């Protein structure tokens, strides 16, 4: 069994991770596969917290461009993340992994309110904690929510799971086949090069709190195990040059 380098992690799952090959919405077999990957590292003793996006159902920024009030559009996006969180929680519990969903919005029928100390206690007891509802504030992305929650729970690393992209490239590898993969970037390099790893607010939070980020392809075999073991995978973003 691989040795664990990161004992407590924050895994950021984009909404795109839930849609599989369907192109929209939630693909249940895909969610089950994600749950099985998470189960694997839980059984290794890793404390796992997750932030989910909602772009497979709703994109607030896109809706705002179509004329919908930005604040309303962003709140709709937060609700989309709750749908994804509930689905993932069910998949994890079917795998025998005790899971709690905490929401930044008040939806007490389906999720606990976000309380930092309670979240940490869940993690210490070996439960997976899914954070839904973003930060609870409009104009804030789920990437920012991931950075914020990771810092609050004192995670060792922020794992940014991507679909079909195995790290950060000099350009979009799907549009530019000649693009090359960065194995390591400093926070400032990621910000200054505008590589769209995550939004500037999220990157700045990681920079200020020296939270390392690993960008990797979730669909790659045992990629989560490699990431938590400190094996070379994807792109590492940290303060070290």
UniProtKB/Swiss-Prot annotation:
It catalyses: UMP + ATP = UDP + ADP. It is found in: Cytoplasm. It comes from the Bacteria. Keywords: Allosteric enzyme, ATP-binding, Cytoplasm, Kinase, Nucleotide-binding, Pyrimidine biosynthesis, Transferase. Transmembrane segments: none annotated. ATP binds at residues 12-15, 55, 59, 163, 169, 172. Pathway: Pyrimidine metabolism; CTP biosynthesis via de novo pathway; UDP from UMP (UMPK route): step 1/1. Catalyzes the reversible phosphorylation of UMP to UDP. This is Uridylate kinase. The lineage of its organism: Bacteria, Bacillati, Chloroflexota, Dehalococcoidia, Dehalococcoidales. The gene is pyrH.
